[in-house]
From Swiss-Prot:
UniProt-listed GO biological process terms: protein transport
InterPro entries for this protein: BCP1_family (IPR025602)
First-listed, main subcellular location of the protein, grouped into a coarse class: cytoplasm
Residue segments, region Disordered: 1-34
Protein task: Involved in nuclear export, actin cytoskeleton organization and vesicular transport.
Organism annotation: Chaetomium globosum (strain ATCC 6205 / CBS 148.51 / DSM 1962 / NBRC 6347 / NRRL 1970) (Soil fungus)
UniProt cross-references to PANTHER family, sorted A to Z: BRCA2 AND CDKN1A INTERACTING PROTEIN, BRCA2 AND CDKN1A-INTERACTING PROTEIN
Superkingdom field: Eukaryota
Protein name listed in UniProt: Protein BCP1
GO cellular component: cytoplasm; nucleus
Amino acid sequence: MGKKRSRDADGQGDVEMADPAVTKRDDDDSSDDENMDIVNVDFELFNYDSQIDFHGVKTLLRQLFDTDAQLFNLSALSDLIIEQNTIGSTCKVDDKANDAYAFLTVLNLQEHRAKQPVAQLIEYLTDRAKSNDSLAGVLPELLASDKHVGLVLAERLLNMPAEVIPPMWTCMIDEIEAAVEDKEPYEFSHYLVVSRTYREVASSLDQSERKQKKAREEAELQFFHPEDDEMRKHAVASGAYDFTKEGEAVADSKRAFQEMGIKPCGFMMLIEASKFQGAVQAIAEYIGTAT
């Protein structure tokens, strides 16, 4: 993998990652394991570039917020992320001019709370937190206070290997430390990580309303990103919440294996700043062990 130097606006610096292998099956015989080819893909991390990254970041934000993406001014939010071009990374293949396959950033909610996209996010996250017992007791009050909370936004294409994640998070921690040394507003009390999860639910075509409700209550959370399952162990509060714009019929259109549907949910993890680096180290170890 290419390297990205902390706070170097041209990208490509100090964090190494072994090239993940991407497996491609021969189209002529998809059932024959002997036709499996191993393709080494070289991923590189870059700082944000306003001339290149707007559409890629906006597309990934739309994926992150799923059906609730329509509630936000994603264009303004993308611009704000890109303006912070020394904090966070995009992950690309081959060339800086390509669209991002993944992105990671942190926004100071207190510093930017008067800006429309951040005000929308604060209102939305406060409302959604109230629907989850773990989050309701701490997050609404914290977001209404004058404490500096770092909102972590991260997303990647679903077929991206998990190995790209630890270098991105490690880079960002280094960049935050450098920014704090430069007296920039990145000294946080907490980090609020927004992600997605899902439940497998029986098709609404096959269930009465009572059975649907019971199935939703019993369905176990599954994670699109395996690192989230590890990171939540370090959170003072975490939990899933329903998207406000998604009805049960949507899950029916995404029928998965064994006649089950996929019901995406939002997911938040609130981590104390003093425990954040440990959480990042834990997901690096977890991904290294799991692969």
